[in-house]
């Protein structure tokens, strides 16, 4: 499937036995959420339970931790802010070449399907996927139905397929109950997004359900770094994704660790 040696080698750092736990900490440009100011501390604490970290270039070049951990480094290329007239208008703020210079194992982009600038975002994604092919570096595409489009099985399925058609190597999409229909439309790894911070119980149940329906893992940021117990949550994700454990088993193993 991944026909180039460079991509295959780098993908193996992200995907372990076909599964992955990714920690996105690229939220600081959008809005400085609680915990985002402690990237190094959070990554150092949870490093045993994650396979990859997503950050922007500014964080990567200043980090004292990212160069010394086993987790893969993914540099995020897209950005917009919550203060903008159109927060869904994602713009490219760095290059694949810069990401490689920073030591990236992969790059990621965010595409908002249904937004006013959907066409421009799709065009950029297509160009970036070709550059990634040239350098043998995997592309993770975060594909979201946004704007006036509701998050439904059909819209998420369509968004995922767009990312696949554009040349992405991994897809990150929102959770829907019929996640198996999303997975079925693409023969590349599809990871479920963690979503906004909420109940630990509900969050972990969503992840468990997505894994049971074919998800290749989870990319969860706010539910980890915004938690009062990030290590506990990261460990639970690792047990569900890599250990095929049910949430009830995780709770029993950890002594009813999930309280929310």
Curated annotation (Swiss-Prot):
Show the SUPFAM superfamilies listed in the entry. Aldolase
Q: EC number(s) of the enzyme? A: 2.2.1.10
GO annotation terms (biological process): amino acid biosynthetic process; aromatic amino acid family biosynthetic process
Q: Does the keyword Transferase belong to this entry? A: yes
InterPro entries with a match to the protein in the record = ADH_synthase, Aldolase_TIM, DeoC/FbaB/LacD_aldolase, DeoC/FbaB_aldolase, FbaB-like
State the superkingdom: Archaea
Catalytic residues in the record: 26 (proton acceptor), 144 (proton donor), 172 (schiff-base intermediate with substrate)
Q: Which UniProt keywords apply?
A: Amino-acid biosynthesis, Aromatic amino acid biosynthesis, Schiff base, Transferase
Keyword Amino-acid biosynthesis assigned: yes
Citing just one GO molecular function, the answer is: hydro-lyase activity
Which SMART domains does the entry link to? DeoC
Transmembrane spans:
none
Q: Where in this chain does the entry annotate a coiled-coil region?
A: none
**Family (UniProt):** Belongs to the DeoC/FbaB aldolase family. ADHS subfamily.
Question: Could you tell me what this protein does?
Answer: Catalyzes a transaldol reaction between 6-deoxy-5-ketofructose 1-phosphate (DKFP) and L-aspartate semialdehyde (ASA) with an elimination of hydroxypyruvaldehyde phosphate to yield 2-amino-3,7-dideoxy-D-threo-hept-6-ulosonate (ADH). Plays a key role in an alternative pathway of the biosynthesis of 3-dehydroquinate (DHQ), which is involved in the canonical pathway for the biosynthesis of aromatic amino acids.
User: What is the protein name for this chain?
Assistant: 2-amino-3,7-dideoxy-D-threo-hept-6-ulosonate synthase 1
